Amino acid sequence: MEHYDVIVIGAGHAGLEAANICDKYGLKTALITKNQSDLGKLSCNPSIGGVGKTHIASEVDILGGVICKIGDKSAIHYRVLNLSKGPAVWGVRAQIDRDLYAKNMQKYIKTSKIELIEDEAINLSLIHI
């Protein structure tokens, strides 16, 4: 049986960020996903940031996350929202090329030390060593 320091189940945005940070800290990390080709798949309105989310994206970036870095590599348009109002309510939004983002995220994860496992997590047994 293989030993991992961390096993992340699900490769959505949060799962990718969790696996990324664990890998950066040198932890042996496995990332389980049903379909590797779905890594980095964005919603139908692919954007990062905006009025309510710019601060969250910035915090993830400052803490070593990857979403903004991959977003910058995949952006097709940037806009600062609410410029007619004060700086306290400005929000940067990047429109993202969905296919390019997925391609860049897959490349990033596959060049890391994260072990991708294409499977389902059905029955978990935790063994303390």
What are the residue ranges of the model-derived segments?
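Conserved N-terminal/central alpha/beta ligand/cofactor-binding core
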Residues: 20-121
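N-terminal Rossmann-fold NAD(P) dinucleotide-binding loop
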Residues: 15
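Beta1/beta-strand and adjacent pyrophosphate-binding region of the FAD-binding site
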Residues: 2-12
